[in-house]
Amino acid sequence: MIQSRQLEAFRPVMLTGGMTSAANLVRITQPAISRLIRDLEEEIGISLFERTGNRLRPTREAGILFKEVSRHFNGIQHIDKVAAELKKSHMGSLRVACYTAPALSFMSGVIQTFIADRPDVSVYLDTVPSQTVLELVSLQHYDLGISILAGDYPGLTTEPVPSFRAVCLLPPGHRLEDKETVHATDLEGESLICLSPVSLLRMQTDAALDSCGVHCNRRIESSLALNLCDLVSRGMGVGIVDPFTADYYSANPVIQRSFDPVVPYHFAIVLPTDSPPPRLVSEFRAALLDALKALPYETI
């Protein structure tokens, strides 16, 4: 069987045209190079060089073999390069699942910053409901997820992130627009555009209003916070939404105000539990946490 050391000797001989120069190139003795070439010729049963005194002339067979050996070494060099890039986290792919609110704009900024100095890193961002995020990440279909989380979920490691305060949205010209903070009692009798009854934020909003004895007119509900913002901008009522969606919609005609009492907006980074995350995933998680901590939203 051909040995790798024999090929490592054959290649520099072909490149330099002599045993001595090849020995100098790879920093071994000339007799050692000569012995490896003889062993290679004996192994394959073919003469690779015509010897005339101190001169070597490659045979036709040597030329054919050299092409294959070059492919082999080029492949190894490429593997070395890939391994080095992976070590630096400059190569690879990320699959991220995220529920709607952070995916609207925030995640785009995180990805843009993360891959700016990683030209060989690819990212796939899938925007799905929170429950689907949990399912997909637990099945290891995705490397990392961002989800609203209520309690533990099997197959997942969760990393809590800063909890933000939900905000109150008002249409332009609303009677409360001059207030820096809207209190629940200010909304007595108001038309309140609500999220779906199964939404955690909706439940928390209802609890905050009920604790203050506030009664609102809940004529319109929407399963999507972005639709709620649009309805507010059309003067259909006021709304309580997460700060991600409110920020994304801020260029439109809506007024954003702090809301009291606090309606917490909790979510988490989730990862599969079966194995430690690859370095690239760990670095993306760290970048994500840094970006969340830098947000100007009110925290709890």
Curated annotation (Swiss-Prot):
- BP GO annotations: positive regulation of gene expression
Q: Which residues cross the membrane?
A: none
Asked if RNA-binding is a keyword of the record, the answer is no
Q: Which domain of life is it from?
A: Bacteria
CDD domains listed in its UniProt record? PBP2_LysR_opines_like
HTH lysR-type domain location is: 1-59
Q: Carries keyword Transcription regulation?
A: yes
Disulphide-bridged cysteine pairs: none
Keywords associated with the record: Activator, DNA-binding, Plasmid, Transcription, Transcription regulation
- Please give the PROSITE patterns that the UniProt record associates with this protein: HTH_LYSR
What does the UniProt function comment say about this protein?
A: Positive regulatory protein for the noc operon involved in nopaline catabolism and uptake.
Regarding protein family, the annotation reads:
Belongs to the LysR transcriptional regulatory family.
Q: What is this protein called?
A: Regulatory protein NocR
What organism does this protein naturally occur in? Answer: Agrobacterium tumefaciens (strain T37)
**What is this protein's gene name?**
nocR
